Amino acid sequence: MEHHNSHLLPGGSEKMYYIAHQQPMLRNEDDNYQEGYFIRPDPASLIYNTTALPADDEGSNYGYGSTTTLSGLQFETYNITVMMNFSCDDYDLLSEDMWSSAYFKIIVYMLYIPIFIFALIGNGTVCYIVYSTPRMRTVTNYFIASLAIGDILMSFFCVPSSFISLFILNYWPFGLALCHFVNYSQAVSVLVSAYTLVAISIDRYIAIMWPLKPRITKRYATFIIAGVWFIALATALPIPIVSGLDIPMSPWHTKCEKYICREMWPSRTQEYYYTLSLFALQFVVPLGVLIFTYARITIRVWAKRPPGEAETNRDQRMARSKRKMVKMMLTVVIVFTCCWLPFNILQLLLNDEEFAHWDPLPYVWFAFHWLAMSHCCYNPIIYCYMNARFRSGFVQLMHRMPGLRRWCCLRSVGDRMNATSGTGPALPLNRMNTSTTYISARRKPRATSLRANPLSCGETSPLR
């Protein structure tokens, strides 16, 4: 049985993509040609790379009836010839399409499984550090913990279900309840991230522009976080209402009764305006606020003091601390924008029928989908790299784990031996006090060694 990746359209052979919301490339099937009809839905959102559909006539092995009618879609009918002699069991072995090959599935596993693992571990560690360390319980860190919870929601529910159903199985195996929840949680997670970044920028803006004003208290910050989640849940509420299971216009899905999870809007107009509104609420408005606040903050923090104005060491330390925090949050904002903005712009462009027939579209959609899903594992890396307290919390947590503690101890012992023998980087030399007093002579050596090396192999200092 030979498989082709083309469609027979009126006036010649042309490749075409079916469009259906929230779905990726599907399988190609053209076998044993016979007269039928080609049904093309009006484009809605994402790609079906599939072939023509048969009519419900006597010569068909099966036909589309009312079971594959999609509400709100307009159909055009063409005469075509369709091949359909295949079975559900041997399809994977016979398909030569790139999206169904074993090599592509291996690539998908290698790209998405690390995101799932690193995002859960990293964001879980961020939450643990914030809530278990008293000095880390600041207003900004509460907002950062809210960001981490949103990323955990995305990584635990959306990442595995999306790549398994879209790229591995090509159908939805998780049931109707998870179909509603996964689509809902993805929108909620993005909205929470956007609104929390806005809350952080406003908190930083007030603290830097009006330093004498009362700061936002921790209690007030918890109310803001609850409000952010409530607004995100309310804004994304239409998505689980219109989500459901459906058999797409693909011969393989129809014959094998394989369902997909998608949004089924009553009309394309409603879908378009909601998608446009969601794009504005997720990106346009938050980015406008973030650009304004961080531009003013940058001018104030990096501006030089007027000549003749005194600047103490304390002022310099506070200015450096503010610059570090602003740099870290700016990095978080830039990474969020670079990861999610291309995918959401693509969602809007898919409403254009001419763009939906663009040949490289499946590859662009796959790349942008991976980029958007990968965002949930980047923030912990940024915190660890750009914030000394988070970095210290990560190190102390590693010392509490037996396997990692042994590795860290062996590494630190090796560094000390290399420094002693001169083969490695030398440890910093501390000035030794040669004068001995009565109090220093009575001091216990063990206490001195613990102060000098609080993270020794035998002891683990508590997170404070």
Curated annotation (Swiss-Prot):
Keyword Oxidoreductase: no
Cytoplasmic side: 127-148, 211-221, 296-329, 385-464
Superkingdom of this protein's organism: Eukaryota
Location of the protein in the cell: Cell membrane
Positions of glycan attachment: 49, 79, 85, 183
Classification via PANTHER family: G-PROTEIN COUPLED RECEPTOR, RYAMIDE RECEPTOR
Family stated for the protein in its record: Belongs to the G-protein coupled receptor 1 family.
Task performed by this protein: Receptor for the neuropeptides RYamide-1 and RYamide-2. The activity of this receptor is mediated by G proteins which activate a phosphatidyl-inositol-calcium second messenger system. RYamide signaling may suppress feeding behavior.
Protein name, entry field: RYamide receptor
